[in-house]
């Protein structure tokens, strides 16, 4: 049985990754799961300089998921490269870095710092950040800005570049086409949906940041629809995620058009989910007579 996939030039031993922001740097979970056995660990979002993150509360549980407004708390790219990457390299973890910038120039600079670093397999771009130079509009909501960010990063690195698409748009295909035009090697989708909650006793928003990102099973139908749409129109491999909590969910994503899947919120519930889910995928493939995971990709379009 062949579980290997090629995600835009990144060779994965299996098609199950863990999503950025839900698995730390991979090392935090090492008491529960061997991170090197996961297809890829997409590490915590990294910025050029250290960031303290948003004021609390930062997380709020919803009936079918959770809202988070962490605010990209992280020690900065230099600390990641100096302290975390060598330990991941020792364990032979397939690492995909995740970077977030305040400007196109910052994305390009971080890409240049990652270029040539042994142990980095690719770069995921968090483009759900406000563009400080353009009045705070999110990079990922404007097709031309998406194209510019991807193109600027591609100029600075030979690593595969994977923009993570925001679902908070009216036309996801237009955004995906712009990313492809900028030179993206693959697409990661989807990021969180914007949301909020209100405490009726305090009569104010629950989250310190007021707004947050909704993740978990609630967003799965949205993710599936968007992946299905993009698969039909854009010739790039897709890393699909959004509400995957079991192997049945993952299989739906493959059939919609995802080459690989990423587990996010589910990691908080079950740290071993990625590998348990992989076993479920294998069992399904055996029962259904599939010899390669690639046979499942996009099969719902046939």
From Swiss-Prot:
<dbReference type="InterPro" id="IPR012135">
    <property type="entry name" value="Dihydroorotate_DH_1_2"/>
</dbReference>
<feature type="binding site">
    <location>
        <position position="126"/>
    </location>
    <ligand>
        <name>substrate</name>
    </ligand>
</feature>
<protein>
    <recommendedName>
        <fullName>Dihydroorotate dehydrogenase B (NAD(+)), catalytic subunit</fullName>
        <ecNumber>1.3.1.14</ecNumber>
    </recommendedName>
</protein>
<dbReference type="GO" id="GO:0004589">
    <property type="term" value="F:dihydroorotate dehydrogenase (NAD+) activity"/>
</dbReference>
<feature type="active site" description="Nucleophile">
    <location>
        <position position="129"/>
    </location>
</feature>
<dbReference type="InterPro" id="IPR024920">
    <property type="entry name" value="Dihydroorotate_DH_1"/>
</dbReference>
<feature type="binding site">
    <location>
        <position position="44"/>
    </location>
    <ligand>
        <name>substrate</name>
    </ligand>
</feature>
<dbReference type="GO" id="GO:0044205">
    <property type="term" value="P:'de novo' UMP biosynthetic process"/>
</dbReference>
<dbReference type="InterPro" id="IPR033888">
    <property type="entry name" value="DHOD_1B"/>
</dbReference>
<feature type="binding site">
    <location>
        <begin position="242"/>
        <end position="243"/>
    </location>
    <ligand>
        <name>FMN</name>
    </ligand>
</feature>
<comment type="subunit">
    <text>Heterotetramer of 2 PyrK and 2 PyrD type B subunits.</text>
</comment>
<dbReference type="InterPro" id="IPR013785">
    <property type="entry name" value="Aldolase_TIM"/>
</dbReference>
<dbReference type="GO" id="GO:0005737">
    <property type="term" value="C:cytoplasm"/>
</dbReference>
<comment type="function">
    <text>Catalyzes the conversion of dihydroorotate to orotate with NAD(+) as electron acceptor.</text>
</comment>
<keyword id="KW-0285">Flavoprotein</keyword>
<feature type="binding site">
    <location>
        <begin position="191"/>
        <end position="192"/>
    </location>
    <ligand>
        <name>substrate</name>
    </ligand>
</feature>
<dbReference type="InterPro" id="IPR005720">
    <property type="entry name" value="Dihydroorotate_DH_cat"/>
</dbReference>
<dbReference type="Pfam" id="PF01180">
    <property type="entry name" value="DHO_dh"/>
</dbReference>
<feature type="binding site">
    <location>
        <position position="126"/>
    </location>
    <ligand>
        <name>FMN</name>
    </ligand>
</feature>
<dbReference type="InterPro" id="IPR001295">
    <property type="entry name" value="Dihydroorotate_DH_CS"/>
</dbReference>
<keyword id="KW-0520">NAD</keyword>
<feature type="binding site">
    <location>
        <position position="20"/>
    </location>
    <ligand>
        <name>FMN</name>
    </ligand>
</feature>
<feature type="binding site">
    <location>
        <position position="216"/>
    </location>
    <ligand>
        <name>FMN</name>
    </ligand>
</feature>
<comment type="similarity">
    <text>Belongs to the dihydroorotate dehydrogenase family. Type 1 subfamily.</text>
</comment>
<feature type="binding site">
    <location>
        <begin position="68"/>
        <end position="72"/>
    </location>
    <ligand>
        <name>substrate</name>
    </ligand>
</feature>
<dbReference type="GO" id="GO:0006207">
    <property type="term" value="P:'de novo' pyrimidine nucleobase biosynthetic process"/>
</dbReference>
<feature type="binding site">
    <location>
        <position position="98"/>
    </location>
    <ligand>
        <name>FMN</name>
    </ligand>
</feature>
<feature type="binding site">
    <location>
        <begin position="264"/>
        <end position="265"/>
    </location>
    <ligand>
        <name>FMN</name>
    </ligand>
</feature>
<keyword id="KW-0560">Oxidoreductase</keyword>
<dbReference type="InterPro" id="IPR050074">
    <property type="entry name" value="DHO_dehydrogenase"/>
</dbReference>
<dbReference type="InterPro" id="IPR049622">
    <property type="entry name" value="Dihydroorotate_DH_I"/>
</dbReference>
<keyword id="KW-0963">Cytoplasm</keyword>
<feature type="binding site">
    <location>
        <position position="164"/>
    </location>
    <ligand>
        <name>FMN</name>
    </ligand>
</feature>
<feature type="binding site">
    <location>
        <begin position="44"/>
        <end position="45"/>
    </location>
    <ligand>
        <name>FMN</name>
    </ligand>
</feature>
<keyword id="KW-0288">FMN</keyword>
<feature type="binding site">
    <location>
        <position position="190"/>
    </location>
    <ligand>
        <name>FMN</name>
    </ligand>
</feature>
<comment type="pathway">
    <text>Pyrimidine metabolism; UMP biosynthesis via de novo pathway; orotate from (S)-dihydroorotate (NAD(+) route): step 1/1.</text>
</comment>
<keyword id="KW-0665">Pyrimidine biosynthesis</keyword>
């Amino acid at each position: 049985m062949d579980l290997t996939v090629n995600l835009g030039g990144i060779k994965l031993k299996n098609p199950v990754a863990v999503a950025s922001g839900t698995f730390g740097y991979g090392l935090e979970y090492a008491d529960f799961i061997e991170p090197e056995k996961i297809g890829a660990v997409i590490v915590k979002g990294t910025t050029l300089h250290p960031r303290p993150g948003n004021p609390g509360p930062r997380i709020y549980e919803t009936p079918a998921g959770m809202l988070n407004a962490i605010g990209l708390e992280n020690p900065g790219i230099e600390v990641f490269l100096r302290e975390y990457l060598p330990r991941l390299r020792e364990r032979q973890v397939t690492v995909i870095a995740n970077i977030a910038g305040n400007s196109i120039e910052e994305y390009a600079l971080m890409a240049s710092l990652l270029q040539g670093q042994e142990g980095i397999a690719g770069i995921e771009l968090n483009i759900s950040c406000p563009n400080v130079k353009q009045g705070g509009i999110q990079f990922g909501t404007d097709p031309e800005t998406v194209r510019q960010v991807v193109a600027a990063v591609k100029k600075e690195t030979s690593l595969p570049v994977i923009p993570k698409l925001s679902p908070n748009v009216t036309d996801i295909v237009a955004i995906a086409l712009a990313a492809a035009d900028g030179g993206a090697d693959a697409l990661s989708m989807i990021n969180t949906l914007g949301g909020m909650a209100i405490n009726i006793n305090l009569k104010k928003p629950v989250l310190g940041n007021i707004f947050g990102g909704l993740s978990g099973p609630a967003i799965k139908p949205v993710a599936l629809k968007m992946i299905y749409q993009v698969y039909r129109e854009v010739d790039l491999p897709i890393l699909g995620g959004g509400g995957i909590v079991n192997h049945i969910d993952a299989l739906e994503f493959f059939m919609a058009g995802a080459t690989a899947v990423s587990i996010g919120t589910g990691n908080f519930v079950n740290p071993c989910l990625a590998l348990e889910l992989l076993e479920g995928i294998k069992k399904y493939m055996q029962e259904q007579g599939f010899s390669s995971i690639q046979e499942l990709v996009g099969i719902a379009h046939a």
